[in-house]
């Protein structure tokens, strides 16, 4: 996928802070997703032959998801604007099951927690695949990178 491009990876991810903060649980998910994303990712803007490493700023504007990509030194690489419409249902469903999961871990039986978690993971996978498909032809990412990016899309959506 990105074997011919040097340093096809992210070294920094920033979320639009103008949207504000969310619940402590959501902020924890954000922090973990960013940490994991920076630790291990495969990220290459299609058509960029210079390679990375890259910085990514994710933001929302008028129901659109904006990927602003620069090199590590700040030089602009690309900006991609995606409609949130294809992700809206899965984000909404994921948020509902996410809330159920966090309520369950405080009081439910282990089997109920496991069942909810399986549903949560399934929706997360669906959202990750949808995001990866939406990025096709714009940004090449592997599945694990798409999963972490989907978490951040959810965080932005929950804040906004």
From Swiss-Prot:
Regions crossing the membrane: none
Short name of any one Pfam family annotated for the protein: UPF0262
Top-level division of the source organism's lineage: Bacteria
InterPro entries: UCP032146
Family recorded in the similarity comment: Belongs to the UPF0262 family.
Name used for this protein in its record: UPF0262 protein BSUIS_A0274
Species of origin: Brucella suis (strain ATCC 23445 / NCTC 10510)
């Amino acid at each position: 996928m990105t074997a011919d491009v040097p340093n096809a990876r992210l070294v920094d991810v920033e979320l639009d802070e103008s949207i504000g903060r969310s619940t402590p649980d959501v902020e924890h998910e954000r922090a973990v997703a960013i940490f994991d994303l920076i630790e291990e990712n495969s990220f290459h803007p299609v058509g960029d032959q210079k390679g990375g490493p890259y910085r990514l700023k994710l933001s929302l504007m008028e129901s659109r998801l904006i990927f602003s990509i620069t090199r590590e030194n700040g030089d602009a690489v690309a900006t991609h604007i995606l409609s949130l419409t294809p992700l809206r249902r899965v984000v909404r469903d994921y948020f509902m099951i996410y809330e159920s999961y966090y309520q369950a871990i405080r009081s439910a039986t282990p089997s109920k927690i496991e069942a909810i978690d399986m549903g949560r993971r399934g929706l997360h996978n669906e959202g990750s695949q949808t995001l990866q498909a939406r990025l096709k032809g714009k940004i090449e990412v592997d599945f694990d990178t798409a999963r972490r990016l989907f978490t951040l899309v959810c965080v932005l959506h929950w804040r906004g």
